[in-house]
């Protein structure tokens, strides 16, 4: 089987790039710096289904991402979760949280309608994150701005 990004992740996220194992996405919700790692392995639903090598690599990539997001966005707390109740494809959320954000201290899911980024905000975020993450590579044949949400009323429902 060939890896294919779940349609819901494609709809709700903006492609940033990829690491050795994972595709890096940014959730199109400007209320929170919210990023998603998706291991580029076909038919994966759970972390334990990955090979031992891939599990270790996922841990490294997730830790690297979380640390750099915390630094870049001066996080009060990083929320990291692999839930997958709505989107069965294995994906790991990395959400920068602040004690002053709208949903604090509750989880962000389903609390408020998403507020999509403007094209300028997307460009600014892509520049910042790519500068911070030295080893993120482009996703072949994919322009980040082509994944802008067309449905501007999407809720924070990718879980």
Give residue spans per PLM region.
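HIT superfamily nucleotide-processing domains
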Residues: 1-90, 94-159
């Amino acid at each position: 089987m060939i890896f294919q990004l779940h349609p819901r992740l494609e709809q709700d996220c903006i492609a940033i790039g990829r690491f050795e194992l994972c595709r890096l996405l940014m959730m199109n919700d400007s209320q929170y710096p919210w990023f998603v790692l998706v291991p580029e392995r076909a038919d994966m639903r759970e972390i334990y289904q990955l090979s031992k090598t891939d599990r270790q690599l996922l841990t490294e990539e997730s830790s690297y991402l979380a640390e750099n997001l915390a630094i870049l966005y001066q996080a009060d707390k990083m929320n990291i979760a692999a839930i997958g109740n709505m989107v069965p494809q294995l994906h790991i959320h990395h959400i920068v949280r602040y004690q002053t954000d709208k949903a604090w201290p509750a989880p962000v899911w389903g609390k408020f309608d998403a507020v999509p980024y403007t094209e300028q905000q997307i460009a600014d975020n892509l520049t910042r994150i790519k500068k911070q993450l030295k080893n993120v590579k482009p996703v072949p044949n994919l322009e980040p701005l082509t994944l802008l949400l067309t449905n501007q009323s999407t809720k924070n429902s990718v879980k």
